[in-house]
Amino acid sequence: MGLGLTSAALNSCSDLLSESAAMQLKGEIPAEGLPFRISLAQWSLHKSFWTGKLDNLDFAQYTKEQFGIDAVEYVNQFFSDKATDTVYLSKMNQRANDHGVSNQLIMIDAEGNLASLDEKSRLQAVENHYKWIDAAKFLNCHTIRVNAAGKGERNAVASAAVDSLGRLSEYGAKEGINVVVENHGGYSSDASWLAGVMKQVNNPYCGTLPDFGNFTMSLFPYKKYDPLQGLKELMPYAKGVSAKAHDFNSAGEDKSIDFPAMMQIVKDFGYQGHVGIEYEGYKLSENAGIKATKELLIRSGQGLS
């Protein structure tokens, strides 16, 4: 998920892939032969969900019919009060099964800071996440994505994150569910920090969800971790990959993210799981942006050495 950090609105319109061009893409490039599989992150359609244009129960069907994608990544914000509602979760399963779509993971937000230096609130945050591990298991997902958010001295925040992730990973291991951290702002966007946390947790059910676009550590002052280096440091622990895209030039390449280079790193680490499309641009509609990102991801995959 995004941090709202793109400056795409300031870019010239002259080299953008037009809305109409993206919407009129014909004959999608077949994904066969790629060293990875493609999924769709629900956040790519967050505007449609927030406005009520789309309903969470329709996500799997919409993904298959509109984009030809058969794997989905949910965001708990769109069914935040349903974690323990097995009737509702059963409907989600049924909708996915009816359309041949596999549920991959749930991205968890707004359940507290897992790296808070306030122990009471941090342990409550850990407790708040347990129900989502249960929900993920019910939905036949393999993973939940959490945020290692916290403020304070670097090492102290890391220690807090290690303790919380250790607790969650132990619970996840019992249920067969991975707990992964996305580089998602603050210390977590510092790949060396997050890799260090992973080393300390040292649990096979704890890992990372590297996001191509979330390496900005702070805005004031602006500080960004090198994305290519960051991806290399996070891939050893990756249990998923988030292919963030913003805006595109006339050749259909992302203007701020080097997709071919990023995907080469993903391949070089032997990753063969799902790569989730997460379109977060403003110049194209959500549907057009998702389609453009899918085409870019496939082209990048087909060009790997």
Residue ranges with predicted function:
Residues D55-V75, N140:
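Catalytic domains of carbohydrate-active enzymes, especially glycoside hydrolases
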Residues L54-D58, T86-K91, R122, V126-Y130, ...:
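Charged helix-capping and loop-helix junction motifs
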Residues G4-A9, A22-P30, Q61, R95-P210, ...:
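Active-site acidic/histidine proton-transfer and metal-coordination neighborhood
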Residues A71-Q94, A148-E153:
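Glycine-rich, proline-tolerant flexible connector loops at the mouths of alpha/beta enzymes
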Residues L40, T63, A96, A125, ...:
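Conserved, mostly hydrophobic/aromatic
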Residues S12-W43:
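C-terminal segment of N-terminal export signals and the immediately downstream linker at the start
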Residues G33, A71-V72, G166-Q264:
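Acidic/histidine-rich catalytic cores of soluble enzymes
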Residues F36-Q42, D70-Y74, N103-I108, I144-V146, ...:
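Hydrophobic faces of well-ordered beta-strands that scaffold small-molecule active sites
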